Regions:
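Residue-level preference for the first positions of well-ordered beta-strands
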Residues: 120-124, 152, 186, 202-204
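Walker A/P-loop nucleotide-binding motif
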Residues: 117-137
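N-terminal pre-Walker A segment at the start of P-loop NTPase domains
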Residues: 90-114, 279-282
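N-terminal nucleic-acid engagement/recognition segments and initiation subdomains in replication
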Residues: 1-50
Length: 282
């Protein structure tokens, strides 16, 4: 007799099966266990359970349901931009071959990453605004924390510079404000590094500036002439980026414009439909 195939478990509509959600509090996202974890048959929503280690001792470990307090703390500590709290690699839509290659490389980085190992390659995503670079960075940090318990941190370059200046004004030593950046397993900097370089820890980067020789794409900051990445950061730092990173071009249409046009098209269609069904005046 053929055994019946067990019915697939329904995926939670709130968390999509991840077991956690992000709640926005002021200007940051706080990870919290989803209500669906209360029904976990292993930990009953506690997030921790006892398991035997390789020596036969009972140890307290995090449950895979999503309610593990340590994992929630790691996710909160990512400091992801609030607009990108729900962005995942699985939800990244690649509209061009370059975006597809970048997505595959981002996924491979997560799959192959070994916590604590030194000498792992860094990544630098190069692309015009709106092509999904921050989405990739956020999705990678999120998966690394959720799947592998990796300590990560997202920093926006110019805000980081502001924090550094503030630290100096308050009399902090360079070691005091650099230590949090040195300690994390993976650091993501949006918009361009020697403290990470010397520690042998990988860094995820994104920039709007093109590599030298890139055709059909240029970028210039307000009031400045167009520059490529080497001109922007200088030959020394550009050379170090080549040594540290695999450089990936994330080329494609500006997704902010694409989504804006799609919203306008939907609104126009809705208006036309409403006018077509409106009763005629007598």
């Amino acid at each position: 007799m053929v055994e019946p195939v067990p019915a697939a478990k329904p995926v939670c509509a709130l968390c999509g099966g991840e077991g956690f959600t992000f709640q926005q509090r002021e200007d940051k996202g706080v990870a919290a266990a989803c209500s669906c974890t209360v029904h976990c048959p292993s930990c009953h929503g506690q997030g921790r359970l006892y398991a035997r280690d390789e020596r036969g001792y009972e140890v307290l470990r995090g449950c895979g349901c999503g309610a593990d307090p340590r994992r929630l703390s790691l996710l909160t500590g990512l400091r992801l931009p609030t607009k990108f709290l729900a962005r995942t690699l699985g939800g990244y839509r690649a509209y061009s071959p370059a975006q597809q290659r970048s997505l595959l490389r981002a996924s491979r980085f997560v799959d192959e990453f070994v916590p604590g190992a030194s000498g792992q390659r860094a990544l630098l995503f190069c692309g015009p605004p709106g092509t999904g670079k921050t989405h990739l960075l956020s999705g990678m940090l999120r998966e690394l924390a959720a799947r592998k318990g990796v300590r990560g941190r997202y920093e926006e370059f110019f805000l980081l510079l502001s924090d550094i200046r503030d630290g100096f004004s308050r009399g902090l030593s360079s070691r005091e404000w650099l230590e949090p950046l040195r300690q994390v397993d993976v650091l993501a900097i949006d918009e361009i590094l020697s403290v990470r370089y010397n520690a042998g820890r990988p860094t995820l980067l994104a920039t709007n500036y093109p590599r030298p020789g890139t055709v059909g794409w240029e970028f210039k900051a307000d009031g400045q002439s167009a520059e490529n990445l080497e001109q922007r950061v200088g030959p020394r730092i550009y050379s170090r980026l080549h040594e540290m990173c695999d450089l990936m071009d994330v080329l494609g249409d500006d997704q902010r414009e694409v989504q804006h046009d799609a919203r306008q098209a939907r609104d126009s269609a809705a208006d036309a439909s409403a006018r077509g069904t409106r009763p005629a005046r007598s």
